[in-house]
A protein has these predicted regions:
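Hydrophobic alpha-helical bundle signature of multipass membrane enzymes
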Residues: 1-234
Length: 234
């Protein structure tokens, strides 16, 4: 952003916080439409249930569950079904989930959390210096940047050495990714739900920024880095 004046209702905290809230509500409405009116993708739990019934109730294999036969065969070829069956002591082909109540009742694609995360961090990357580098120390022996990551059991932090410094853009991307991937870990989404919904949220945020620019009296530009490595100037 080229304007160097102190902001309040335009480039200050109130407008940024307001836009983050606004883009979140628009993202939820947009992804809700995709869920119910376009894709209606079955949740992983639902797919797992169909696979379990296919394998445990043989008379369904040539009936109502025949369409999933190619999927079951592909999983057999990768020996995934054997691993799941062994893990469950032969009792079920279902995998454990993080939610005791099971998956949400609405369709899987796109992911609401990922869409909101993609939209909100895009707003933040637009208003802040996304290239700003975090002031990390350097290792004297190698000259690499010192950062930290959790140890194997999550009880503490261990030092890691980085070739490149951490930036605002990179850290915001991590936040969006962690929010989105967390839903995959929980067992309620697929990878494509995550990555494509981040991009959907990004496009919603860019649309709002383009729309909002006409309401500003200042002549300014914003360069927004994109998840695919490109950039968009507003």
């Amino acid at each position: 952003m080229e304007d160097k004046q102190q902001g309040f209702a335009t480039f200050g905290g109130p407008v940024i916080l307001t836009l983050v809230c606004e883009v979140a509500t628009r993202a939820l409405k947009a992804v809700r439409y995709q869920k119910f009116n376009v894709h209606r993708r079955l949740r992983p739990e639902g797919v797992g249930g169909l696979i379990d019934r296919y394998l445990t109730i043989p008379n369904l294999q040539d009936g109502e569950l025949k369409p999933i036969a190619p999927l079951v065969e592909a999983l057999r070829n990768e020996r995934l079904l054997d691993r799941v069956n062994q893990f469950n002591n032969g009792q079920s082909y279902l995998l454990p989930m993080a939610f005791p109540e099971g998956s949400p009742m609405h369709p899987s694609y796109g992911a609401g959390h990922a869409t909101v995360a993609g939209a909100c961090v895009t707003i933040l990357k637009a208003f802040f210096d996304h290239g700003w580098q975090l002031p990390l120390g350097k290792d004297e022996a190698t000259g690499r940047y010192i950062a930290y990551e959790p140890n194997a059991d999550g009880s503490g932090l261990v030092e890691v050495l980085l070739e490149q410094p951490l930036t605002v853009e990179g850290e915001l991307n991590k936040v969006a990714a962690n929010i989105s991937i967390g839903r995959n870990w929980a067992g309620v989404h697929y990878f494509t739900d995550y990555i494509e919904s981040l991009r959907l949220g990004e496009q919603i945020a860019i649309g709002i920024l383009e729309e909002q620019k006409f309401t500003f009296g200042e002549n300014f530009t914003m360069t927004v880095p994109l998840f695919d490595g490109g950039a968009r100037q507003i």
